Amino acid sequence: MADPEDPRDAGDVLGDDSFPLSSLANLFEVEDTPSPAEPSRGPPGAVDGKQNLRMKFHGAFRKGPPKPMELLESTIYESSVVPAPKKAPMDSLFDYGTYRQHPSENKRWRRRVVEKPVAGTKGPAPNPPPILKVFNRPILFDIVSRGSPDGLEGLLSFLLTHKKRLTDEEFREPSTGKTCLPKALLNLSAGRNDTIPILLDIAEKTGNMREFINSPFRDVYYRGQTALHIAIERRCKHYVELLVEKGADVHAQARGRFFQPKDEGGYFYFGELPLSLAACTNQPHIVHYLTENGHKQADLRRQDSRGNTVLHALVAIADNTRENTKFVTKMYDLLLIKCAKLFPDTNLEALLNNDGLSPLMMAAKTGKIGIFQHIIRREIADEDVRHLSRKFKDWAYGPVYSSLYDLSSLDTCGEEVSVLEILVYNSKIENRHEMLAVEPINELLRDKWRKFGAVSFYISVVSYLCAMIIFTLIAYYRPMEGPPPYPYTTTIDYLRLAGEIITLLTGILFFFSNIKDLFMKKCPGVNSFFIDGSFQLLYFIYSVLVIVTAGLYLGGVEAYLAVMVFALVLGWMNALYFTRGLKLTGTYSIMIQKILFKDLFRFLLVYLLFMIGYASALVSLLNPCPSSESCSEDHSNCTLPTYPSCRDSQTFSTFLLDLFKLTIGMGDLEMLESAKYPGVFIILLVTYIILTFVLLLNMLIALMGETVGQVSKESKHIWKLQWATTILDIERSFPLFLRRVFRSGEMVTVGKGTDGTPDRRWCFRVDEVNWSHWNQNLGIISEDPGKSDTYQYYGFSHTVGRLRRDRWSTVVPRVVELNKSCPTEDVVVPLGTMGTAEARERRHGQTPSSPL
């Protein structure tokens, strides 16, 4: 009998028919099968391995090709196995047991297995050939999501064997086109994912490195986003450097719906470019790397699909909070200075977007007061880029200094759209009254008022009143006999003719001046028509009525009188426009505007519905009037009853007037006698009076009181805005040469340009005092405070025109006065026409006094 432990007949096992098929299961085990060097596991381990094998590959080796939905729904795979070629049904991974004919046969086989080997017999079976692992999108995405580099073993062999790449459609997310690289970047652990370098190495070996790195999202929501965008958003500089070194596109544009402004349905607009994303997320270290790396540098002058540069993007994300304004302004200066050093011939701040807006104009249009104030008051001490400053100190003496503000883009003198016009004429800017109080805007408006605004305004008041008096006289003393046009024979007739000509000319003048403002420049929306452009709209209607009146008069139509009286009423109402010149009456006109276009409009809309509904019901209760046939020819004195005794064809319109009289308490109930059901008629009338006279009228009074209260609280700001509008209206009415004559400011040489030539700019001077920072004024132009003749800077001698000679004599008394009661905080007080009390009131949040 053979020795049970003698393995001599081991060679016969391979050819034995009773060889168990379950012993081949170890060929498919990857992670759980020990290496040959490891000791063999006992029977419990083998049983556990079979159990795990069933759980791992449950459903993985079904007959036939897998269904697509099964691949999509699969999420976790412990091991990846390539299905072998079509096999027989018994070639299964599951252990169904060994086929045995008789128990003794099994016993005999076991004794032969352990017999001692015989010399020259066949050795053990060689190691099985390596099995190629299979990878698909769910498996690959799961591996990179877990950050398991071991799971990527065999991926390169699989791709090379099947001639595939990681950018193929089978490895992309169907809905977004996302590859495994963005998936890995979106699943970082402590800022790292060890599968990313392996994926890049595999892509490089398969020959599609750039395509793999720059593969964008293709869905509508995230279209254009690349792995570089995600690495920047995740604030991973090491991966940003790795991607750029491998060839990432530093100018890729993310244009999906998610990356659009909020008012267009988006969530976060950052300017589409990777550099803009780094700037808008406050990552200066990445900004420095993208613009200074030795592989591919990002161009600071690059614009997105809207034409916005990185500076526009910073303005777009500003929200006027302290934290946001602090980092936005710091990043803004960083990029501006960096661009000036990298591209000396380009002023990044002067580039316009597709809407024709610079970053400064965009800040004004969107009401970003924090970044707006920073731009117009920017002062740079670095001599190499000092030409980027918009504020220059002319002289300083202790806490007092005189500053020169660059007026480029602020006040363009009609040559192009200015920031001042954007602030005044754009009603969508909710905080524009605050932005108008920022220096030098505030002092600039005062200077315009002193130079030409006040005189022109009062001349306009007198001229308009004279024109309206003439219009009233020609309407009152018009001829009563004969059809128009009336003859001109006497001196009075010729005076009337002169008055008619003057009235017609004023109508034509108002027509052309206001049609330009309404439909070309000032009023882009309906709200602007009825709020900011209310008087322009009324003047336009008045001019149309005057022109129509003249046409009907010359055409011999007597109905010209009906049109003329409407024009006369509207003309006198338009005189309220000139109440803007004084604070006392200016606030009153604003109250009237808001009540008319807000409260009264809503009241009339509801009241009209009530009146039509009740009139229809009440008229239906009246008995119809008898027809004219009821009076026979024998009754010559027969008279037909009419309203209010009965209902005829004119009853509805007459009844509407009666209901209005009831609303104001002047009506009667004569029609009650002719009602078919007097009780129902009385009930309807009582409910109508309650709803209109008691409810609606009192609601109107309450709303009007609320509006008056709101206007009173903001009367200073609202009136100042109207005052600024009046100044610009007067300036825009001047021809271009007069605008240049009355332009505020002075031409000053503030230093040297980038090419070494004198940097001459049109600046506006504002005297200020700062009690916290003394002797810290860098870059002062003039050594002698208050000197107005000449000054030296960079070796150039310049003459300053139109500089006030008595400036120093007015500054010193103000400083002495301020020194009596000065707060300890950092206070900058403009020393123009603004008083000391106004400066303190602004600092403590109170309403300052009138600038006039």
Curated annotation (Swiss-Prot):
Binding of ATP, residues: 178, 183, 187, 222-225, 234
Notes on the domains: The ANK repeat region mediates interaction with Ca(2+)-calmodulin and ATP binding. The ANK repeat region mediates interaction with phosphatidylinositol-4,5-bisphosphate and related phosphatidylinositides.
Listed PROSITE patterns: ANK_REP_REGION, ANK_REPEAT
GO CC field: adherens junction; apical plasma membrane; cilium; plasma membrane
Motif Selectivity filter location, chain numbering: 665-668
Assembly behavior: Homotetramer. Interacts with Ca(2+)-calmodulin.
Function according to Swiss-Prot or TrEMBL: Non-selective calcium permeant cation channel involved in osmotic sensitivity and mechanosensitivity. Activation by exposure to hypotonicity within the physiological range exhibits an outward rectification. Also activated by phorbol esters. Channel activity seems to be regulated by a calmodulin-dependent mechanism.
Gene Ontology MF: a single term: calmodulin binding
TM stretches of this protein: 456-476, 494-520, 534-554, 559-579, 595-622, 680-708
Segments in the Extracellular topological domain: 477-493, 555-558, 623-651, 672-679
Intramembrane stretches listed in the entry: 652-671
Subcellular location, record wording: Apical cell membrane; Cell junction, Adherens junction
Binding site for Ca(2+): 668
Protein activity control: ATP binding enhances channel sensitivity to agonists. Ca(2+)-calmodulin prevents the ATP-mediated increased sensitivity to agonists.
Recorded catalytic activity of this chain's protein: Ca(2+)(in) = Ca(2+)(out)
A Pfam family: Ank
Name used for this protein in its record: Transient receptor potential cation channel subfamily V member 4
Binding site for a 1,2-diacyl-sn-glycero-3-phospho-(1D-myo-inositol-4,5-bisphosphate): 235-237, 282-285, 330
UniProt effect for mutating residue 178 to A: Strongly decreased affinity for ATP and Ca(2+)-calmodulin. Abolishes ATP-mediated increase in channel sensitivity to agonists
InterPro entries found in the cross-reference section: Ankyrin_rpt, Ankyrin_rpt-contain_sf, Ion_trans_dom, TRPV, TrpV1-4, TrpV4
Entries under PANTHER family matching the protein: TRANSIENT RECEPTOR POTENTIAL CATION CHANNEL SUBFAMILY V MEMBER 4, TRANSIENT RECEPTOR POTENTIAL ION CHANNEL PROTEIN
Stretch list, region Disordered: 30-51
Major site of localization recorded for this protein: membrane
Organism superkingdom: Eukaryota
Biological processes, Gene Ontology terms: actin filament organization; calcium ion import across plasma membrane; intracellular calcium ion homeostasis; osmosensory signaling pathway
Membrane topology: Multi-pass membrane protein
